[in-house]
Structures are given as structure tokens and as C-alpha cells.
């Protein structure tokens, strides 16, 4: 039976009833009434504290500090913000030494990137390693982005071009941390089961979803695909794939300090899924811009929850449209049947034709 926390007015009334029962001849407007209200206020404070404490016991309702502590108890560490690293292409007029700590700036965002080691480049173009001085996903600049030297170097052109920049991630949101905790509870570690590979992949900063394929290329092989939904381009880069692969192959558990990872004698294939756009034709009532946008969001969320190579059931597509708030009637004209994604593809929302 659910317990309803009594309100202050309820506690005052209960106190008045108790005093009236025990002192039936007590007159109104006396000091007992004041004492009753003071006691009721103290009791209300205790009830509110107990109500708050009860929410902290359950991870799904706990506040940040308590959720993090509960996750640590289960061996899960909140993923901290990470720094983007990569390569920039510079052009030198002659043999030039680029010192470690040389700073390049993206004038559009104000982000700065610093060289990680001293590099000697010959006349022409060369790629040098840099890292962003700011943590977070914003450091993952697109290839071709122009950077400027903050201090001139003799023989080096003042501009550089991003060749690749990845690995930057924001601190893990509480909702994603909670999702990993629930997954850990529902699928305990099993020494190399398919859900272990999913758990390991999603422990890497920036990785939000992962899929595991047993016997990917036959016996003794495992395939792992993943996505990075917090970024503008959610598909992993080769550098992301290398990081996830290295983590799955072996890493030190931050909580226990023990080494863990995939079993020996397993051939691991880590790859980036590909996009497969799914188009729709929908007759909608009421056919308003607001409802269209709501249906678009509902379909995008449905497709995002589908896995790699998933089968998209037409009945679920219809239900997704029907369950959108504000919808009165609809007909899904296209697709006309279930949609089978290709084996290494994930679904994204394509074009919607409103009829």
C-alpha cells in the first residue's frame, strides 16, 4: 500500500483532534494550540526529510551525488569529460622546428589546440599531433577546419588545417549513467558474454550505444558496432574505433583496480555502422505543423532505439505515430511492410511526405 506523506495542515488537524480527545474541556485560543502547531511543523519537516531520503535509496529517483555513489558500489564510474586529439596539417617554407606547446586557434569558436611534442617538419606540408585545451565534444572539429597560429614561427605559414580531430566528450549525463547502471544490474558481468562487450564499449567516453554480434565471422569471432550520439556526426571515426578496441581488449577497472577485458582466443572486429535512411508517407489528422514536428520527433526516437541491422515492424511504426500527443487519426501509406535494415546499418529518419 502506498504511503502518502501528511501535509502540515493534516498534522495540525491530527494534533488538534488528539488534544481535544485528551482534554475535552480545553478552551480555544490557548497555549496548547501554539504548541500543537510547533510540533506539527517539526513533524512535517521530519516527514519531508524521510520522503527525500526514500527517493535517494532508489537509483531511478536518487539525486546526483547518491546516484554516483550507488554506481560506484556497483562498479560503475561516471564518464568524465575528455579532450579531443588529432592531427593538423601545417605548411613550412623550409625545414622548421615546431616546439611542443605551440598553440593553434579556431577563430570561429575560440577553441585552442596545443602541440603535444616537438616536431621538425621539412619544406612542404606535414601532419602534427595536437590536443584541444578544452574538454568536451565541441573540440571534435570537422576535417578541413582552418586554425591559426597564436604566435608566429619563422618558416611556418600562419594557418593550419584540421586533418582529423576526435575523442572529445562531455561529462556523462545522469540519464545515461543511470541507463548503464540498470544495464549492469539486469546483465551482470559474465566473463565475455555479448552483453559484456556492450558494457565495455559504452564505458568509453563519448560512446552512447553499442551492439554485439556473436560469431561475426564464424566461430571464435565477435563483432562490435557503436555510435556517439552526443556528437553532430554520430558515426565513429577510425580513432574512435581504435580507442574502443583497445579498451575492450583490456583495461584496468577504476573501482577495483583489477585488469579486465575480452577473453583470450577471441578475434575482435570493431566497426562503425552505416546510416540507412527510412522514408515515410503519412496521412495525418490534424495535419498541422506542430503535430507534424511532434510525429517527426517520435519517429526519430523510435528509429534511434532500433539496433544495427534491426527489423522495423510496420505495426510499431503505426503505433509510434498514433501515440504522439495531439494525434487524432493517421494512415501510414509508406512503408507498406516491415523494413529490414542491412546487417551493418542503423536507421535514421529520412524524408516524410505528408498527405
Curated annotation (Swiss-Prot):
Q: Which domain of life is it from?
A: Bacteria
Please report which protein family the annotation says this sequence is part of: Belongs to the Mu gp47/PBSX XkdT family.
Write down the Pfam families for this protein, in alphabetical order: Baseplate_J (PF04865)
Output this protein's name.
Mu-like prophage FluMu protein gp47
Looking up InterPro entries in the UniProt record yields:
Baseplate_J-like (IPR006949), Phage_Baseplate_Assmbl_Protein (IPR052399)
UniProt cross-references to PANTHER family, sorted A to Z: PHAGE-LIKE ELEMENT PBSX PROTEIN XKDT, PROTEIN JAYE-RELATED
Amino acid at each position: 500500500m502506498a504511503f502518502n506523506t501528511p501535509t502540515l495542515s493534516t498534522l495540525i488537524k491530527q494534533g488538534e483532534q488528539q488534544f481535544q480527545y485528551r482534554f475535552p474541556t480545553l478552551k480555544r485560543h490557548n497555549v496548547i494550540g501554539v504548541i500543537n502547531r510547533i510540533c506539527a511543523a517539526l513533524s512535517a519537516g521530519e516527514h519531508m526529510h524521510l520522503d527525500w531520503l526514500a527517493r535517494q535509496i532508489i537509483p531511478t529517483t536518487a539525486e546526483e551525488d547518491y546516484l554516483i555513489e550507488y554506481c560506484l558500489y556497483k562498479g560503475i564510474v561516471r564518464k568524465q569529460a575528455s579532450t579531443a586529439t588529432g592531427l593538423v596539417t601545417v605548411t613550412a617554407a623550409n625545414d622548421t622546428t615546431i616546439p611542443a606547446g605551440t598553440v593553434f586557434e579556431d577563430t570561429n569558436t575560440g577553441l585552442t589546440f596545443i602541440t603535444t611534442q616537438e616536431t621538425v617538419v621539412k619544406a612542404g606540408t606535414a601532419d602534427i599531433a595536437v590536443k584541444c585545451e578544452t574538454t568536451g565534444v565541441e573540440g571534435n572539429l570537422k576535417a578541413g577546419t582552418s586554425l591559426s597560429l597564436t604566435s608566429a614561427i619563422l618558416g611556418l605559414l600562419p594557418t593550419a588545417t584540421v586533418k582529423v580531430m576526435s575523442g572529445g566528450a562531455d561529462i556523462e549525463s545522469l540519464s545515461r549513467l543511470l541507463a548503464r547502471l540498470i544495464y549492469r544490474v539486469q546483465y551482470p558481468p559474465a566473463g565475455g558474454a555479448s552483453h559484456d562487450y556492450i558494457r565495455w564499449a559504452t564505458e568509453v567516453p563519448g560512446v552512447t550505444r553499442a551492439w554485439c554480434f556473436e560469431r561475426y565471422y564464424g566461430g571464435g569471432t565477435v563483432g562490435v558496432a557503436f555510435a556517439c550520439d552526443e556528437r553532430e556526426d554520430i558515426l565513429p571515426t577510425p580513432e574512435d574505433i581504435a580507442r574502443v578496441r583497445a579498451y575492450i581488449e583490456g583495461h584496468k577497472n577504476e573501482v577495483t583496480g583489477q585488469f579486465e577485458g575480452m577473453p583470450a582466443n577471441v578475434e575482435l572486429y570493431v566497426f562503425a555502422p552505416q546510416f540507412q535512411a527510412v522514408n515515410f508517407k503519412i496521412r495525418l489528422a490534424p495535419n498541422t505543423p506542430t503535430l507534424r514536428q511532434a510525429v517527426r520527433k517520435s519517429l526519430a526516437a523510435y528509429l534511434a532505439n532500433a539496433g544495427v541491422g534491426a527489423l522495423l515492424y510496420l505495426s510499431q511504426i503505426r503505433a509510434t505515430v498514433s501515440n504522439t500527443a495531439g494525434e487524432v487519426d493517421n494512415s501510414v501509406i509508406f512503408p507498406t511492410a516491415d523494413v529490414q535494415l542491412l546487417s551493418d546499418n542503423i536507421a535514421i529518419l529520412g524524408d516524410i511526405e505528408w498527405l
